[in-house]
């Protein structure tokens, strides 16, 4: 078994910023129907494992989540189930056997409130950053529109003003093909 480097940290009652990418950064989630299925699985499985999703975005070759888990040990079960079910779906759909869909996931414990909101904003602008849309509100596979509809454009603009985005991209999580 390969050990993740750095090792995952599973803590109870903790908020995390998560990034997961497809194997070799391939755009496997490349249709609306596939993205809809992955977003459905994400929401359904998070409920089963007591994972509270604060914000998320799903792109054709990676996703980002901002979440909280009550029991740290549930996080590994959540990702195992999400990645297993989504890979099975995609491989069945495309009639491919035993293809590796996901590479790994990276987690980071949220340090403080500012860290939370900066990553909240980063998630919501990610589809624009990677060129999948010109406006955040036009991208369907994100919680941005949900927050916009619930809280209004002034609230969203204030989030971005108070906690500007920092580009967290490193070479290993640069998802440009």
Residue map of PLM features:
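Short catalytic/metal-binding and nucleic-acid-binding patches
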Residues: 1-177
């Amino acid at each position: 078994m390969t050990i993740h480097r750095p090792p995952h940290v599973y803590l109870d009652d903790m908020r995390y910023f998560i990034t997961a990418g497809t194997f070799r950064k391939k755009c496997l989630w490349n249709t609306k129907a596939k993205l809809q299925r992955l977003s459905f699985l994400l929401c359904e499985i998070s409920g089963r494992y007591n994972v509270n999703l604060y914000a998320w975005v799903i792109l054709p070759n990676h996703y980002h989540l901002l979440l909280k888990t009550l029991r740290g040990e549930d996080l590994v079960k959540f990702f195992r189930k999400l990645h297993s079910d989504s890979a099975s779906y995609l491989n069945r759909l495309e009639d491919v056997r035993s293809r590796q869909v996901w590479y790994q996931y990276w987690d980071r414990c949220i340090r403080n409130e500012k860290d939370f909101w900066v990553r909240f904003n980063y998630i919501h602008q990610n589809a624009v950053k990677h060129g999948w849309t010109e406006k955040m509100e036009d991208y369907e596979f994100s919680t941005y529109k949900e927050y916009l509809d619930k809280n209004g454009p002034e609230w969203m603009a204030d989030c971005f003003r108070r906690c500007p985005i920092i580009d967290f991209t490193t070479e290993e999580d640069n998802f440009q093909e």
